[in-house]
Amino acid sequence: PFTSGTKGVHKSVVMTHGRILSVATDWVAMTGLSGNDRYLMVNPYFHMFGLKAGILASVAAGATMYPEAVFDVDRALARVAAEGITVLPGAPTIYQAILDHPDRGTHDLSTLRVAVTGAADIPVELIRRVFDELPFSVVVTGYGLTEAGTASATVPGDDAETVATTVGRPRPGFE
């Protein structure tokens, strides 16, 4: 994987195979990812989330991957309905776009099970709406680094305020 290059050129990141796999298997356990899941992948594969919590977690769990090069709310809503997508990660703006879409009610979103957000400030009201208006049974937020993997995350069952205002607790392997 590569860093974002916020202070210059992108840098490659060295990470042990053991650490990469532990991030992926922790993600599988935390979200309950399984071979029955259909994962709409909107996160880039060149950094931590897309690679470790996306591709590798899906391979470890046997989940079906549905890549999206660029998020488009109309295409995403149609794909959720057509493919029975169960896992939808993304920045808060993705959920805001879905919640505010004028045609949301015309799409069958009943298969959505896992929402994972982070990467930006999250308004509490947005997470309340995700809980109240979308069918997700698991809604979590996390914080991670390409260099280290998922450092902390909320867990299934945390309330909207916890999901929106914290990055949860340290994940296995972090202190």
Regions found by a protein language model. Name each.
Residues 5-6, 62, 119, 144:
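Conserved G/P- and acidic residue-centered "switch" motifs that form tight phosphate/ATP-binding loops
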Residues 72, 93-95, 122:
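Alpha-helix capping/helix-boundary segments
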Residues 21-38, 46-87, 101:
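Conserved AMP-binding/adenylation subdomain of ANL enzymes
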Residues 1, 25, 96, 128, ...:
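Active-site phosphate/pyrophosphate- and oxyanion-stabilizing loops and adjacent acidic/basic residues
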Residues 11-14, 41, 63-70, 140:
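Short beta-strand->loop structural element characteristic of the AMP-binding/adenylate-forming
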Residues 17-18, 37, 43, 83, ...:
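Structural detector for helix-capping/boundary residues
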Residues 1-22:
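Conserved AMP-binding A3 loop
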Residues 82-90, 99-162, 172-175:
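Gly/Ser/Thr-rich phosphate-binding loop
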